[in-house]
Regions:
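Active-site glycine-centered loops adjacent to acidic/histidine catalytic or metal-binding residues
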Residues: 63, 125, 155
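Conserved C-terminal guanine-recognition region of P-loop GTPase G domains, centered on the G4
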Residues: 53-58, 80-151, 222-226
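P-loop NTP-binding site
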Residues: 190-301
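Canonical P-loop GTPase G-domain recognition
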Residues: 118-119, 128-186, 190
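Conserved G1/Walker A P-loop phosphate-binding module
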Residues: 1-88, 96
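Catalytic P-loop NTPase motifs of RecA-like helicase/translocase cores
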Residues: 44, 67-69, 101-102, 130-131, ...
């Protein structure tokens, strides 16, 4: 087989304020649900590496927590993880929501981009939710504030213009061989992905302060002789009242969380799953360094 001398490989940070569709975009591009999705801000808490391998290029996406002004130690960790990613990559995707006006969150990020020498591509997402004539003024508003290397309007949900986005990204990647095996799509351990899928269901089914106060850990994950997978996971919250909400009347909420999470986990693992969920209280865990370290925050995972 003739070697492709023009093959490119590189790392691309995906940044933006919370809830602009970063994880939806990455999941769609790699064709697998790795980063969890929710309409709640600060859904992504850690840097997630997702790998797209094509004949001419391997693009390693780093899906980052939304950059925002932190209100607690967990928030400080999330922003540090997002901003630290910018130093390691070949290009940056700045994802914005076409349905919302440019606000303080975008200005906050643009200030931080001024310090980077990396090419920044403006990705205007949710194009399917606006009229076409509305796109140009939105783009002009952003390009008037920053000198972007490229601009690509897309719809991640409807898979509109994603090939154009990939072509734009490849312009800024260095030539070189693949960093990762062709069949590898993430560096995330299965346990971590499973924990995130459980947390995603909590985000979907609860509201108010609950989503931000939740952490999930997989305590046990074993394959049984019949190839079924047994998983025991603990959902941590900060208050007894939150624990009651997660469990629900006669355990109904916890059962619904488990049923929805189990379906996604079975798709991920390709095996029948027995999911055993527990709920525990760790008071004010988001502001306690020791607990944050136990949950894997504040260090590279």
């Amino acid at each position: 087989m003739e070697k492709n001398e023009q093959h490119k490989s590189g790392f691309v940070a995906v940044i933006g304020r919370p809830n602009v569709g970063k994880s939806t975009l990455v999941n769609t591009l790699i064709g697998q649900k790795i980063a969890i999705m929710s309409d709640k801000p600060q859904t992504t808490r850690t840097r997630i590496l997702c790998i797209l391998t094509q004949p001419d290029a391997q693009i390693v996406f780093l899906d980052t927590p939304g950059i925002h002004k932190p209100r607690h130690k967990l928030g400080e960790y999330m922003v540090k993880a997002a901003e630290g990613t910018l130093k390691e990559v070949d290009a940056i995707l700045f994802v914005v929501d076409a349905t919302e006006k440019m606000g303080p969150g975008e200005f906050y990020i643009l200030e931080r981009l001024q310090a980077t020498m990396k090419p920044v591509i403006l990705v205007v997402n949710k194009l399917d939710l606006i009229d076409k004539e509305q796109a140009l003024p939105i783009i002009s508003h952003y390009t008037g504030k920053y000198s972007f290397a490229g601009v690509v309007p897309i719809s991640a949900a409807e898979q509109v213009n994603l090939d154009s986005l990939l072509d734009e990204i490849k312009k800024y990647l260095p030539e070189g061989p693949q960093y990762y095996p062709e069949d590898m799509i993430t560096d995330q351990p299965e346990r971590l992905i499973v924990a995130e899928l459980v947390r995603e269901k909590v985000l979907h089914l609860t509201r108010d302060e609950i989503p931000h106060a939740v952490a999930v850990e997989v305590d046990e994950m074993t394959t049984r002789p019949n190839d079924d997978v047994y998983i025991r996971a603990t959902i941590y919250v900060e208050r007894d009242s939150q624990k009651g909400i997660i469990i629900g009347a006669k355990g109904t909420m916890l059962k619904e969380i488990g049923a929805l999470a189990r379906a996604d986990i079975q798709n991920l693992l390709g095996s029948k799953v027995f999911l055993d969920l527990w709920v525990k209280v760790r008071k004010d865990w988001r502001d306690r360094d020791g607990i944050l370290r136990n949950f894997g925050f504040g260090e590279e995972r």
